[in-house]
Design a protein with these regions (language model features):
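An accessory alpha-helical subdomain
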Residues: 139-175
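Short basic, glycine-rich beta-strand/loop surfaces that mediate nucleic-acid
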Residues: 82-89, 120-139
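A short, aliphatic-rich alpha-helical micro-motif
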Residues: 11, 78-80
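Hydrophobic beta-strand scaffold residues
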Residues: 39, 69, 106-109
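ADP-ribose/adenylate-binding Rossmann-like module
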Residues: 84-89, 95-121
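Residue-level detector of alpha-helix initiation sites
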Residues: 22-24, 93, 139
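Intrinsic disorder/low-complexity segments
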Residues: 54-76
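Hydrophobic, well-ordered beta-alpha structural blocks that scaffold small-molecule cofactor pockets
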Residues: 1-45, 50-53
Length: 175
């Protein structure tokens, strides 16, 4: 397995598609919305937390994040202009077909719990204001990445975010 190239994507206003309506899909959608993405979630069923999330989406930003829940009526895979796709279903065959369609259309896809089918991995992230530290095992052991993130969160105090914001202002004055 080739090691990935680490980068941070600006997802504000970008069309993202998530297949699946369970707890894992909900977590992925929450992370996308936090970054201002326009999310469409397609599934046969939606868990209650996801339905609740759909009712509360709409922060005050330049481009507000959106969430649309669409009922899947058949197994067709329609990307509708999505720029990023996450397949979070329990149907491995569907996920594999979604990956094939995305590759054909040159759209990046993450297939949850199947690193071989992924074009990108979603890292465990430590966030302290503008500080973001991404931890990835390239899909080898997400549990290890999660545990390392938890340890780093203990080490890096929440006040780090405030400090960085002050340093950013100082940097602005020194330009």
């Amino acid at each position: 397995m080739m090691v990935g190239y680490p980068l941070f994507l600006k997802l504000e206003g970008k069309q993202c598609l998530v297949f699946g309506g369970g707890k894992v899909a909900t977590r992925k959608i929450e992370a996308l919305l936090k970054r201002g993405a326009q999310v469409t979630c397609v599934s046969r069923d939606f868990c209650q937390p996801l339905k609740n999330l759909a009712k509360t989406v709409g922060a005050t930003r330049r481009v507000a994040p959106t969430l649309q829940l669409k009922q899947m009526k058949d197994n067709r895979i329609v990307l509708n202009g999505a720029q990023l796709v996450i397949a979070a279903t329990s149907d491995r065959k569907f996920n594999a077909r979604a990956a094939q369609v995305c590759r054909r259309k040159k759209v990046l896809i993450n297939v949850v719990d199947d690193p071989e089918m992924c074009d990108f991995y979603v890292p465990a992230v430590v966030e302290r204001g503008p500080l973001q530290i991404a931890i990835s095992t390239s899909g080898t052991s997400p549990l290890f990445a999660k545990r390392l993130r938890e340890e780093m969160e203990k080490i890096i105090p929440p006040s780090t975010g405030k400090l960085l914001k002050k340093l950013g202002k100082i940097r602005g004055y020194s330009k």
